[in-house]
Regions:
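A well-ordered secondary-structure block
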Residues: 76-165
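Short, well-ordered surface patches within globular domains
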Residues: 13-15, 19-86, 143, 149-155, ...
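Bacterial N-terminal signal peptides
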Residues: 1-7
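Conserved beta-strand positions that form and line the central face of beta-propeller blades
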Residues: 42, 101, 170
Length: 172
């Protein structure tokens, strides 16, 4: 019989203060690393797409859903139009009007209860950024958006509610 002990010292006592704007910038950097590794140009960080992405992340968090579509059925393209943003990239007979990735992460990687009190193993900003990009790159549809050669710009939107981190990435 083996007993596994986890000293409480392994678990950080304080919840980290994650700056959403700094996290957005770091995710953008890591996305560009993936594109360059694939022989593609880095994406321009678009403030307009960022505002649209932030709005969607905030909406998902505040209304407790996780989807590309709002509870009323509003699509990513509808959000672009509502914000007065137009993305129309013509390649031959095909027209691209944008793309979107979403991800829900956590501020912690594990929790241990000691005498009924939770002790969290908090994630750093870097861990959240890397696990988000890794999650997208390991999903065929999300990877396809990230490595789509016709996309030239992206906006990342992060919203933190409780211990959850909502992340939206919009492309054009």
């Amino acid at each position: 019989m083996a007993i596994l002990l986890f000293p409480a010292a392994l678990f950080a006592a304080e919840r980290p203060r994650i700056n959403p704007v700094t996290l957005e910038a770091r995710i953008h950097q890591l996305i560009d690393v993936q594109r360059v590794k694939a022989g593609l140009k880095p994406l321009v960080f678009s403030r307009r797409l960022c505002a649209i992405a932030r709005g969607h992340s905030r909406d998902m968090a505040q209304r407790d859903y996780f989807s590309h579509f709002s509870p009323e059925g509003e699509s990513p393209l509808a959000r672009y139009r509502q914000a007065g943003f137009s993305c129309r990239i013509r390649v031959g007979y095909r027209i691209y009007e944008g793309g979107e990735n979403i991800f829900q992460n956590n501020l912690y990687s594990s929790v241990m209860y000691i005498n009924g009190t939770p002790h969290f193993n908090w994630n750093s900003l870097e861990e959240i950024a890397r696990s988000t990009v890794s999650g997208w790159m390991n999903s065929p549809g999300h990877r396809r958006n990230i490595l789509e050669p016709v996309f030239r710009a992206e906006g990342i939107g992060v919203y933190i509610k409780g211990r959850k981190v909502y992340i939206t990435e919009d492309f054009c």
